[in-house]
């Protein structure tokens, strides 16, 4: 695993642990627990981040996301958290046709 990815994963783990100690809604707690378990199972990091974003974005849009999760939400929506593959899957599947 790349050094930056390890650092990012460690920071995410730390933020998840801190957030789970806060007084947050059950919906938020469930999303964070799922992400934490996925990290423990060494699942694909971009997928974990995507699932966490899917769970928290509606809460952020509706302004019901707990204030204690704002730093975590900013962290997972930052550009360094996104997958930079930029269509690699399309190239892999359609590349043979050209």
UniProtKB/Swiss-Prot annotation:
GO terms for biological process: bacteriocin immunity. The keyword 4Fe-4S does not apply. CDD domains: LciA-like. Keywords: Bacteriocin immunity, Plasmid. It comes from the Bacteria. Pfam families: EntA_Immun (PF08951). InterPro entries: LciA_Immunity-like. Imparts immunity to lactococcin-A to naturally sensitive host strains. This is Lactococcin-A immunity protein. It comes from Lactococcus lactis subsp. lactis.
């Amino acid at each position: 695993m790349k050094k930056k990815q390890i650092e990012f994963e460690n920071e995410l783990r730390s933020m998840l642990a801190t957030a789970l100690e806060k007084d947050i809604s059950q919906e938020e707690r469930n999303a964070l627990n799922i992400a934490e378990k996925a990290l423990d199972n060494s699942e694909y990091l971009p997928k974990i981040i995507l699932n966490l974003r899917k769970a928290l974005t509606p809460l952020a849009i509706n302004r019901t996301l707990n204030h204690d999760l704002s730093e975590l939400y900013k962290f997972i929506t930052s550009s360094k958290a996104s997958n930079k593959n930029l269509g690699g899957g399309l190239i892999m599947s359609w590349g043979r046709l050209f």
